[in-house]
């Protein structure tokens, strides 16, 4: 069944206000909603809802009814999300990646798993995160370090992508993990990868933009939060992220270019977090912080 995106183009402030209007109406129906920046200099943002094409008329009508009282000038636009077989396109030449004891591999490399490896099977697909990017590998290394040295009873993987980091946590420690992403395609891919790795019962998957979901209060607070996204949203959501962290908990942040690390550290130092370690990989950094 084909998927579409209905969206409005506006400013950052108005996009957040639109999101606040949409959340109580669409959240219980598991229709993903999100805001995204289009042009920083011009303050152009989009507020979107993702749905199946068969539901367009109903959702469009309710979306329009929400907008009309407060934002009658906003026009609902439509984007058809293409069905692309990224797995078939991406598998060729994809080699296993080692990060600490983890070995991230595709289904075509199962014969390369060693007896002491913690194997995570992820085929390249429509969601980010096969272990080949420096940020994913840096997160896996840091996950291993944190779980070996800290008492961790539950974890959050914010912006899960392929689910590789949530799977890594669950393979190392038998604890509940909440994995979220704003992209419904990513959540679908992550759910398949979790099933493929045989740990479906331990990972809860939710489509959620930022912290706009009741799932965080239901499953949190968290002893470990992993967020491999981008520097700008990491900085913006620092107070919210730390608010969902249990006392004494740990945070792993990535998706950060080396030159952006000081701004990210400043945001989390301001939120009373303590810097523990930074891992550098191919121009990207992964930052580990603890809450005192």
Swiss-Prot record:
Its main location: cytoplasm. SUPFAM superfamilies: S-adenosyl-L-methionine-dependent methyltransferases (SSF53335). InterPro entries: Ribosomal_L11_MeTrfase_PrmA, Ribosomal_PrmA_MeTrfase, SAM-dependent_MTases_sf. It is an enzyme of class 2 (transferase). The keyword Methyltransferase applies. The keyword Transferase applies. It catalyses: L-lysyl-[protein] + 3 S-adenosyl-L-methionine = N(6),N(6),N(6)-trimethyl-L-lysyl-[protein] + 3 S-adenosyl-L-homocysteine + 3 H(+). HAMAP family: Methyltr_PrmA (MF_00735). This is Ribosomal protein L11 methyltransferase.
């Amino acid at each position: 069944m084909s998927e579409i995106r209905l969206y409005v183009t506006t400013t950052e402030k108005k996009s957040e206000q639109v999101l606040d209007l949409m959340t109580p109406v669409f959240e219980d129906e598991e229709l993903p909603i999100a805001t995204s920046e289009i042009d920083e200099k011009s303050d152009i943002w989009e507020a979107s809802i993702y749905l199946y094409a068969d539901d367009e008329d109903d959702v469009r009508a309710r979306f329009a009814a929400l907008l009309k009282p407060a934002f009658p000038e906003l026009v609902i636009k439509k984007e058809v999300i293409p069905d692309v077989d990224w797995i078939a396109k991406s598998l060729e030449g994809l080699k296993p990646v080692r990060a600490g004891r983890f070995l991230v591999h595709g289904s075509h490399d199962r014969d390369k798993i060693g007896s002491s490896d913690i194997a995570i099977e992820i085929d390249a697909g429509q969601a980010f995160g096969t272990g080949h990017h420096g940020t994913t590998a840096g997160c896996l290394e840091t996950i291993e370090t944190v779980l070996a040295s800290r008492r961790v009873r539950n974890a959050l993987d914010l912006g899960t992508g392929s689910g590789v980091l949530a799977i890594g946590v669950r393979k190392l420690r038998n604890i509940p993990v909440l994995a979220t992403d704003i992209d419904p395609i990513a959540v679908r891919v992550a759910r398949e990868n979790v099933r493929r790795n045989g740990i479906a019962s331990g990972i809860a998957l939710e489509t959620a933009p930022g912290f706009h979901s009741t799932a965080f209060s239901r499953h949190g607070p968290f002893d470990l939060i992993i967020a491999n996204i981008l520097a700008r949203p990491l900085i913006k959501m620092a107070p919210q992220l730390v608010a969902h962290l249990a006392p004494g908990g740990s945070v792993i942040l990535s998706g950060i270019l080396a030159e952006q690390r000081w701004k990210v550290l400043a945001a989390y130092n301001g939120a009373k977090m303590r810097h523990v370690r930074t891992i550098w990989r191919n121009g990207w950094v992964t930052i580990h912080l603890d809450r005192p």
